[in-house]
Curated annotation (Swiss-Prot):
Name used for this protein in its record: Asparagine--tRNA ligase
Gene that encodes it: asnS
An annotated Gene Ontology molecular function: asparagine-tRNA ligase activity
Compartments where located: Cytoplasm
Family: Belongs to the class-II aminoacyl-tRNA synthetase family.
Length: 466
């Protein structure tokens, strides 16, 4: 007897006639008049449950098997046989069932075998992994994560753990969560009446990071090719399907790289990750294609076979102004492109993923390299058909005098970024990178359009349960 995952049985890893033990939870049970019960058991290793055919001569058939309901956990042993029914190649002729956990009250079990709205499932985040849709999201999320790590490993990158607590605001937007151990009921004050952060744990104002980029740059300027993959935080009071207060970012940084190098890296990474999902998780993709978005598989296949288009921001604005389409947000040079503009470019004009580059400096961060025209910076956004922006990146400003001028323009303190400026003082080097919002990627791949449904425990305004 061997312990087997449901996926390994379906993959044919166990010969027909061999005895295996599977462990998991009941999806459904139905009983025939012939004295046989059919049990669907899932263990999360793949989308489909395995069917166990249970005869009524088992010693615990009447007392336990006939009382099994959705959610009960058990260990099931049986012989692998070819399934006569459609839908799966193998099933188990069960020889033993051991119940390990009962559902206290099947009538009130929230995950009983009925379809729930995805909004309702959000209120049951501790139980929703048991549903088909959230289980499938979890497997696809894992597949994408593993593929991204594998891609960078194969490309010779070094993974860097950047800090979650920081004193720097990477985006300069100020939308940061403060980290403090001060007594909120009795805050220490300076003579000027301001909060005295010198009395705080770190001796200064500290925050949860909005990006690992600045820290990653320090390692790229020593190790050449690095990336960070971890949680980031934004105190942005946005209740939309596209925003979270806590989300994961993939951020590579490459020394001696240009903006075009970063664009090529982004294209290669996305295609690698999408191919991995198409090759490894077609069972889950088929579910999403059938139940969530009928274009999921076609969209991914088209993406990996497309050449990325490239367009300057200035030219993109002209395309949008002259396309004859009425947008909710007016288009003029100097605006930040809205989702409707991005999707028009990717879906209707180029009909392919597109890299928009060289944005106006006034709408971009201080660290982006100033172009020779003095008006634009070497920044890019990767736009994908079906979602819009999926990656944002830039060549970094490696010239200290220009960086200092940008800090002054944006009224940011040189003192706060002393260590970042040091990189430009000691062996400065051109370098570039980008940020990929991981949940945005999972949403794109699965077709699940609310970003709160592609992360296990979403954190958003007035939402921090579990």
């Amino acid at each position: 007897m061997s312990i087997a995952s449901v996926a390994s049985v379906f993959n044919g890893d166990h010969a027909v006639g061999s005895q295996v033990t599977v462990r998991g939870w009941v999806r459904t049970r139905r009983d025939s008049k012939a004295g046989i019960s059919f049990l669907a058991l899932y263990d999360g290793s793949c989308f489909d449950p395995i069917q166990g055919v249970i005869p009524n001569n088992l010693p615990n058939y009447d007392d336990e098997v006939l009382k099994l309901t959705a959610g009960c956990s058990l260990v099931m042993t049986g012989d692998v046989v070819e399934s006569p029914g459609a839908g799966q190649a193998f099933e188990l002729q069960v020889t033993a069932v051991e119940v390990t956990g009962w559902v206290d009250d099947p009538d009130t079990y929230p995950m009983a075998a009925k379809r729930h709205s995805i909004e309702h499932l959000r209120e049951l985040a501790h139980l929703r992994p048991r549903t088909n849709i959230i289980g499938a999201v979890a497997r696809v999320r894992n597949c994408l994560s593993q593929a991204i790590h594998r891609f960078y490993h194969e490309q010779g990158f070094i993974w860097v753990s950047t800090p979650l607590i920081t004193a720097s605001d990477c985006e300069g937007a100020g939308e940061m969560f403060r980290v403090s151990t001060l007594d909120m009921e009795n805050l220490p004050r300076t003579d000027a009446g301001k909060v005295d952060y010198d009395k705080d744990f770190f001796g200064k104002e500290s925050f949860l990071t909005v990006s690992g980029q600045l820290n990653a740059e320090t390692y790229a300027c020593a190790l050449s090719k690095v990336y960070t993959f971890g949680p980031t935080f934004r105190a942005e009071n946005s209740n939309t399907t596209r925003h979270l207060a806590e989300f994961w970012m993939v951020e590579p940084e490459v020394a001696f790289a240009t903006l075009d190098d970063a664009a090529k890296l982004a294209e290669d990474m996305l295609k690698y990750a999408f191919n991995a999902v198409l090759n490894e998780r077609m069972d889950d993709l088929s579910f999403f294609n059938e139940r969530v978005d009928k274009t999921v598989i076609e969209r991914l296949q088209a993406f990996v076979s497309s050449d990325f288009a490239q367009v300057d921001y200035t030219d993109a604005v002209e395309i949008l102004k002259n396309c004859g389409k009425k947008f909710e947000f007016a288009v003029e040079w100097g605006i930040d492109l809205q989702s409707e503009h991005e999707r028009y470019l990717a879906e209707e004009h180029f009909k392919a993923p597109v890299v928009v580059k060289n944005y106006p400096k006034d709408i971009k961060a201080f660290y982006m390299r100033l172009n020779d025209d003095g008006k634009t910076v070497a920044a890019m956004d990767v736009l994908a058909p079906g979602i819009g922006e999926i990656i944002g990146g830039a060549q970094r400003e490696e010239r200290l005098d220009v960086l200092d001028a940008r800090l002054a323009e944006m009224e940011l303190s040189q003192e706060d970024y002393w260590w970042y400026r040091d990189l430009r003082r000691y062996g400065t080097v051109p370098h570039a990178g980008f940020g990929l919002g991981f949940e945005r990627l999972v949403s794109y791949v699965t077709g699940v359009n609310n970003i709160r449904d592609v992360i296990p425990f979403p954190r958003a305004p007035r939402s921090a349960s579990f």
